Amino acid sequence: MMGVKSANAQALNVAGSTFVYPIMNKWIQRYHELHPGVSINYQAIGSGAGIAQYKSGTVDFGASDVPLDNKELATMPRPTLNILDVSGAIVLCYNVRGIGPGLHLSGPVIADIYLGRITKWNDPRIEKLNPYLHLPAEPIRVMHRSDASGTSYIFTSYLASVSKAWKDGPGVGKSPNWPVGIGAQGNPGVAGLIRHAEGSFGYIELAYALQNHMPAAVVENRSGNFVAASIQTTAFAVNSAVKRMEKDIRVSIVNGPGVNTYPICGFSYLIVPKFPANAAHGKAMVDFLKWTMTDEAQRMAADLLYAPLPESIRKINLKIIDTIKVR
C-alpha cells in the first residue's frame, strides 16, 4: 500500500493493477508535490481485485490492465468509464546459471513452456533458437500469477494469438487454469520467485525487470524478427492502434504489426465513475486524470520504460475525461 498525505488533504483511494504501480507511485508523489492539498492512496492488489473494490464502492476509482467491456460496464452500480493511463511491455524473465540477457524465444515455444510441453532448458526447440548458448539440462520452473491479473490477461491474449493449443485450451483470462507452474501474488511476487529460484521462467511488466536487474528474453514478432522490449519497440505497437482507438480505446496491441514491434504489449486503464458521488473527490480525480496526460507525467512514464502515449491518443483520452460530470 502506498500513499502521501498532508494536513487537511483531500484523500482519494485507488486500487488495482500491479502492472501500473511503478509509475502510479511516481505520479502520486509528484502530484502531491504540485498539489499538497490532494493525497492519493494506491493499493497494488491486482486488476481483478481493484475492479471488485471499485464495484463495491470502497475506492474512488480502480486500475486495470483489462478495460471493462460493455457487459461488465452494465453490471457496475454506477455509470463507469475506461480511461487510459500508460502502455507497457510484458517480458519473459529467467534465472538460468550462465545465461544473461538476450535468450531468443518464439511465441509457440513460450506457449509450449506454459502448456507443459517443453520442460527442460536444453529442449531442442530452445537450442535451435539459441545455437551459441550452452543451455543446461535442467527443468524449467514456470512461474505465473496467482491472483486475478490484467498482466495475465495480456499475456494469455498473446499466447492465444500464437498457439492454437493455448487458444483452444486454457484460453484468455485474468485467472486462467494454468496447466503448469507456481503462482505468486502480483508482479512483485512473480519477480521475487524468479529472482530466488534457479531455473525459473515467468512473465512480468518491464519496469519490474528493470528494477530487479533481471534478464529478459528477446521474442520473435509477427514479422519473424527477434525484438527486445523497450520504449521504442512498445511504441511501435501503440502507434499501430491509433486509428482503431478513434472509435474505441479498448483495443489489444499484442502481436502487433511492424518489423520492429515487440509482441507482448498492452495498455493500462483507470476505471472511473462518470458521475462521482462526492463532488470534492470527483474534482480532485478529474484534475489528476488530466495531469497524467501532460508531457511531464508521460516523460516520467518513459523513465520507467513505459511507452508514453502519443499526443493523438492523449487527445482522445482527454475527450473522455471531459465527459465526467462533477456535481
Summary of predicted features, one role per range:
Residues 3-327:
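Flexible loop/hinge segments at secondary-structure junctions
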